[in-house]
Structures are given as structure tokens and as C-alpha cells.
Amino acid sequence: MEVLTATFVEEKLKAPVPVESCRFHFPLLRRQVNGKPLVYLDNAATSQKPQVVIDALMRYYNEENSNIHRGVHYLSEKATESYESSRGKVQKFINARSTQEIVYVRGTTEAINLVAATFGRRNVNQGDEVVISAMEHHSNIVPWQMLCEEKNAKLRVIPMNDAGELLLDEYEKLLHERTKIVAVAHISNALGTINPIKRIIEVAHKQGIPVLVDGAQAVPHTKVDVQDLGCDFYAFSSHKMFGPTGVGVLYGKKELLEKMPPYQGGGDMIKLVTFEKTLYNDLPYKFEAGTPNIAGG
């Protein structure tokens, strides 16, 4: 039996695939619009869902529907087992060291907001700086703008040339002792530029600056190894790679996640609650308040 790994998928994608055989796996692509087969090219925004994904969602609601992590009955145990099994698959898919480094969120946007609201608020102060690039998606601009406004910090932007490439010499000049984090796209959603992300990370790390990578467009199209990249945070979404909406991943180095405060309060992110004090849960659950998208996970 062939195992569905990133390398396996990458090799298969090199071979030409008949369009009709692809359509067969996607119910929505079997329909016609204006008398012609539907052609969908907006995968950078969201991908269509193959039948196997739709079947998995239906199977959860038909056979396992229950809350997770907080029940001892059969359905809760089955749902919890399936949900946590998927976390292990994500860990292996991006080669994280541990499932404790895989935080489930609603999408890339929430992952970036989580880091800005926790790591950012704790580490960025008046007069400090955050560095992003000129090709960022709004989701990797606005959270940092909001943080900088709140903290009276400065947002610096890596410029790019007419070919849509970041100017790395200018990038290096932006970094100094008051730079608290660099946040940059792995692949541009607008230009398709594949940034030299490993080099960008190495330059920042020489000055002890952590790096968040927006991988929303990269994970669906290329092999991502977070340990090889050396990134401190990596964010991506399920819905751009044939998965359901409302599911995303924040990878974070364990040593950084442990120092960050919770993002939201509620069920599942706690170990013990009294009216005097709350003891927060271990990683990654400290950042996963409330009932998640269990079916999507």
C-alpha cells in the first residue's frame, strides 16, 4: 500500500494527470455551468473538496458526533481518538518535533492573530519594531498594525523590486536590537513569488529575532519541513489544500509556546479553575479554548 506523504504527493504531481480523472474525485467539478464543464481556478482562495473529505465529514456526524477531551463515554473517546490522530499526522506532515507544537486554530488568519496577541503583546513595547514584507496578505499586515498601534511600536516593510522579489540587502538593514519579530509569506498569494524563506530566517536568527512564516500558499504546493527551515512559527489552513473550512494550524517551537500566555479563555484550555485562580492546560491545549471544529479535524 502506498503511503500518502508529502514526498509521495510531490512525485505524483510531476506526472501529467488527465483532467477528467481529477474531476471524478470532486463532486462540484462534475457539474456544468452555461452548458460547459465547470472550470475552477481560484484554488489560491480556497480549493474544492474531494469526495473522500466530504465522506469523512459525514462519517463523523453519522458515527462519532460528540465533544472531545471531556467525556468518558464511547462516542467522546472515539471522537477524541480521531481528532488527536489527525494532529499526529499534521506533525509528521510538516516534520514538527512534537504534537505539542501543533496548535489547531480556525485558519491562517487566526494563527497569525494568536501570535500577535500573545507573543507580540508580551515582547513588543514602545519604540520596538515589527518587520513584514511588501507582498504580505492582509492577514499578515493588519494584526501587526493593530499590535504596533496598541504598543506605540513601528511596523517596518521589506521592499521588493519590479520582478516581485524581496530586496534582501534592504531587509538586513531593517533589523536591529529593537526588532522583536519578522513575519513574512513563504509564497505570495498575489504574485506567486517563492521567497528565500530559509535565508530570511537565518538572517533574523543571527540577531536573535524570531520569525513567523505565513505558509497558507506554500503547504498546498511544496514540501514544508519546519525543522529544516528553522522557523519559530508557521501558519497555514486546511481549506486551501482540499480540507474543510474552519481548520488551520499554528506550528510554534515548544520553548516559545510555553512562555506565551493563553490566547482565549474557556473550556479545554484549563486544568483547574477556582474563583481565585486558573491553572492552564499543557501544550497545545492551552491555546485551544472551547469546542473546536471536531469534524474538520
Predicted regions and their residues:
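Pyridoxal 5′-phosphate
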Residues: 1-297
